[in-house]
Amino acid sequence: MSLEEVLDEIRREVTPDPEERELVEGFARRILSEVRDRLKERDPDAEVELIGSVARDTWLPGASDVDVFCVFPKDRDLDEIVEVTLEVGREAIEALGGEAREEYAHHPYIGGEVEHRGRTFEVDVVPCYDTEPGEVITPVDRTPHHNRYVEEHLEDTVEARLLKAFVKAIDAYGAEVRVKGFSGYLCELLAIHYGSFEEVLREAVRTWRPGFVIDLEGFVGEVYEDYDEVRETFEDQDPALIVLDPVDPERNVAAALSRRQLTRFILAARAFLGDPSPEFFRGRKPEPVSGEKVRDWFERNPTHVVAIEVRLPDEVEDIYWPQLEKTARSLSRVLENEGFEVRRWHVMRDSEEEHGYVLLEFEHGKLPELEWRVGPSGWVREDRVRGFVRAHGRFWVEEDGKLATRAERKFVRPEDLLGRLEGADRQTLLSHGFGKDLARSSEGEVRLLSAEELAELADRDPELGKALAEFMRGDPLSELVRDRL
């Protein structure tokens, strides 16, 4: 198929039909009305706005997320607007037969699930202030301005839908910490800036590199002296891309995007442009592996893998997931300091969000029992030389004048070191780089798992079966692009 034939086919797929449009927009009107009626009783000066892709008409078929913002005058106290929003949001969701729950991001808000004509909608009711563009009291105050900007500047909503479908299919959609991908707003801004989905892909392949700056409103030359100043401003983020928020030049819309996801997007874009196919919009989700396949893989695998089970804290994923990744990185450093070479690490969780898992892969599972240790030169400070000699006894002097010896290695297998974590207290876990909440919840609960135990987990929990499939088989994107690059 030609590029245009593929895009024509996908344009039809990503555009909601009239029946679905009436379903989604009809529900949005209902929840908006329920919230508005209750909010006006409590604060006549507050307003209600529908926010997000449904409001901006960039949602994909199957959409189930509806975001409602309660917008308050700036003179209201934050605790007051949160309390009012929690009340009206809970009442509105329950009035439609749904279940409400209190959530927390920058401040508390109400989330919930509501059944409507056979579809379950995820509803968020969020408080914010009525601010001017660029004025921020709370981080979510920008969001209504994002709505207005997209509505005013996005000429063809289907181009944003194409981009969203593309990044969703390659598992790069969403700014949450587990994904570190492209938010919906970022997709919309890219469609505005480049004019079309195809042009986004072509420019990504041609120009996107870590630190590349996208400036929709010409802030460079007005707010910033040059592009170097932009990069300096955001250097603490170590950004994959810098997309200056049109409503707030001090914010990088792409701050959540990781270099891994940037690379995956460029690979997918290059492969799609070279050999267009509808497959790029339909995704290749890994099927859960069976326990039998896990056993077989571990028997045949030439490398060495250690699996560690921890107990997750009772926190939202955005809190515990970065701590799980931090733990994997920290343990890798601890192991490397002892001479082990960690080739890669992988983290996953069970479907109940009770346990997390760190998989560490080594090229070799055993080190020599003796290790070479090089000490100071003989002419350096006396205490350093004395310390080395007294610690090791026998030594020789190398050609460059440094003292050297060989000593018995403290840890021969990675399990020798990691085994200290089993049943360990909080302080020991913290000293090995566990995140603070993870160290608290995992105190006395850390276990090293055998291949057999991993196989049993795969059979018991499809979420873990999928995560193990990705670890064992590699990135699903590789199957899509390998014959097209």
From Swiss-Prot:
Q: Which Pfam families match?
A: CAA_C, NTP_transf_2, tRNA_NucTransf2
Needed co-factor(s): Mg(2+)
Residues the record lists as binding Mg(2+): D65, D67, D124
Catalysed reactions, semicolon-separated: a tRNA precursor + 2 CTP + ATP = a tRNA with a 3' CCA end + 3 diphosphate; a tRNA with a 3' CCA end + 2 CTP + ATP = a tRNA with a 3' CCACCA end + 3 diphosphate
Q: Which UniProt keywords apply?
A: ATP-binding, Magnesium, Metal-binding, Nucleotide-binding, Nucleotidyltransferase, RNA repair, RNA-binding, Transferase, tRNA processing
What are the EC numbers?
2.7.7.72
Quaternary structure (record): Homodimer.
Q: What is this protein called?
A: CCA-adding enzyme
Q: Which organism is it from?
A: Methanopyrus kandleri (strain AV19 / DSM 6324 / JCM 9639 / NBRC 100938)
